[in-house]
Swiss-Prot record:
Protein's membrane topology: Lipid-anchor
Biased segments, Basic and acidic residues type: 23-70
Signal sequence coordinates: 1-17
Protein name: Uncharacterized lipoprotein SA2158
Biased composition (Low complexity): 71-102
GO CC annotation: plasma membrane
Region (Disordered), start-end ranges: 17-102
Protein's cellular compartments: Cell membrane
Lipid-substituted positions (S-diacylglycerol cysteine): C18
Keywords in alphabetical order: Cell membrane, Lipoprotein, Membrane, Palmitate, Signal
Lipid moiety-binding residues (N-palmitoyl cysteine): C18
Source species taxonomy: Bacteria, Bacillati, Bacillota, Bacilli, Bacillales
Length: 204
């Protein structure tokens, strides 16, 4: 009987020990699971924070690129404007130089007879008149072309004068006809540059 009691007691202690080990194993497994879940959550949190940081960095990079592109566009526009200004200045200088180089002071033909000067003597303000009238050489060429439409087409420039009427001025040119002794064509050119023959056979 004593042996039976001793055996039951030993079995009871063995089962209790096994149950305790099982509970400890369960607790250990539970702790491992909780730790794994915590680590996984921490990893997700860290990954999320990293993604946010990466997105923020990407946003900064995009903003930086946009600023850089905007700065480059502004610089290119400034350079383009500067180039255009330089080109305009060059064109203005060339135009001014061309005007200066193309200006010809009024002059008489070789061995000129006083024909236009005799018909239309001018005693007014020559400087004021020339400021209103077109370029002398341009007006002379237009008058010569007009004179050659009547009679001989190789008339030679002789002399000029200026006619004034109500504050408006005209050039008066005379052209000698080499084929007709003592005959001249009288041509006027107004301030608009319009040439007109007033007498194709003026006799000196």
């Amino acid at each position: 009987m004593k042996r039976l009691v001793t055996g039951l007691l030993a079995l009871s202690l063995f089962l209790a020990a096994c149950g305790q080990d099982s509970d400890q194993q369960k607790d250990s497994n539970k702790e491992k699971d909780d730790k794994a879940k915590t680590e996984q959550q921490d990893k997700k949190t860290n990954d999320s924070s990293k993604d946010k940081k990466d997105n923020k960095d990407d946003s900064k990079d995009v903003n930086k690129d946009n600023k850089d592109n905007s700065a480059n566009d502004n610089q290119q526009q400034s350079n383009s404007n500067a180039t255009n200004n330089d080109q305009n200045q060059t064109n203005n200088n060339q135009s001014s130089n061309n005007q200066k180089s193309s200006y010809v002071a009024p002059y008489y033909g070789q061995n000129a007879a006083p024909v236009a000067r005799q018909i239309y003597p001018f005693n007014g303000n020559k400087t004021q008149a020339l400021q209103q009238l077109p370029n002398f050489q341009t007006a002379l060429n237009a008058a010569n072309n007009e004179a050659n439409k009547f009679g001989s087409n190789n008339k030679v420039y002789n002399d000029y004068s200026i006619e004034e009427h109500n504050g408006n001025y005209k050039y008066v040119f005379s052209f000698k006809d080499p084929n007709a002794n003592g005959k001249y064509s009288i041509v006027t050119v107004d301030y608009t540059g319009q040439a007109m023959v007033t007498d194709p056979n003026y006799q000196q």
